[in-house]
């Protein structure tokens, strides 16, 4: 899932803004990006262990993550408490975040399992206050791919960006999330998150979100 935000656009560093508004750089990079499209989730249909989104996130879980710019520079760190409630084909997932600069944030996802798509893969639709329209997700094998647009606040400017969001289940209680952030088809950053649930998370949940560790 995506890193949470307050019910407002999210703040990002000035360097990121300069990268995005640099027209010459956008033009040069767009050619490379077009040639390096990521795989389709259907290619992972034989991967194990099988990932069932609503089962994995039902109950309490925790997460640890980082945000990097497109050059691989670490920009932010964060940790998350998650609580999921399943009602039929609908999962309501409450996320509470703490960032390393002390910012607190939250998001509530409402995720509906839609059934099988034309390719025979399980599809989902997700909604949250700061996600434009609805996120569209497809699950195959050990993976889930989300596609959605979101508004980020970057040095005083609101910028609409796209997220290509991938979750890979590693074992019963662990999944890894990689999300790629693009603007005009150009990658401007990425997010890496480790989700921990079940018995593995029972000794960690809830994480302290009062302040970021200083030592």
Positions of PLM-derived features:
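Bacterial signal peptide processing site
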Residues: 37-39
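Central antiparallel beta-sheet cores of small beta-barrel/beta-sandwich binding domains
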Residues: 64, 69-154
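Glycine-rich, aromatic-bearing surface loops/beta-hairpins
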Residues: 164-215
């Amino acid at each position: 899932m995506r890193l949470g935000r307050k019910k407002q656009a999210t703040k990002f560093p000035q360097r990121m803004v300069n990268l995005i508004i640099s027209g010459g750089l956008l033009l040069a990079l767009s050619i490379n990006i077009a040639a390096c499209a990521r795989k389709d989730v259907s290619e992972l249909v034989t991967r194990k262990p099988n990932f069932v989104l609503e089962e994995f996130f039902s109950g309490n879980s925790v997460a640890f993550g980082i945000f990097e710019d497109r050059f691989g520079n670490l920009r932010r760190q964060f940790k998350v408490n998650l609580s999921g409630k399943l009602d039929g084909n609908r999962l309501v997932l409450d996320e509470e975040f703490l960032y390393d600069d002390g910012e607190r944030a939250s998001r509530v996802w409402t995720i509906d399992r839609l059934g099988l798509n034309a390719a025979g893969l399980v599809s989902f639709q997700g909604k949250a206050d700061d996600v434009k329209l609805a996120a569209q997700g497809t699950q195959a094998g050990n993976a889930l791919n989300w596609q959605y647009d979101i508004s980020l606040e970057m040095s005083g400017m609101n910028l609409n960006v796209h997220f290509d969001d991938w979750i890979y289940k590693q074992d019963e209680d662990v999944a890894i999330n990689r999300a790629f952030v693009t603007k005009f088809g150009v990658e401007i950053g990425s997010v890496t998150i480790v989700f921990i649930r079940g018995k593995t998370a029972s000794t960690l949940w809830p994480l302290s979100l009062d302040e970021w560790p200083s030592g």
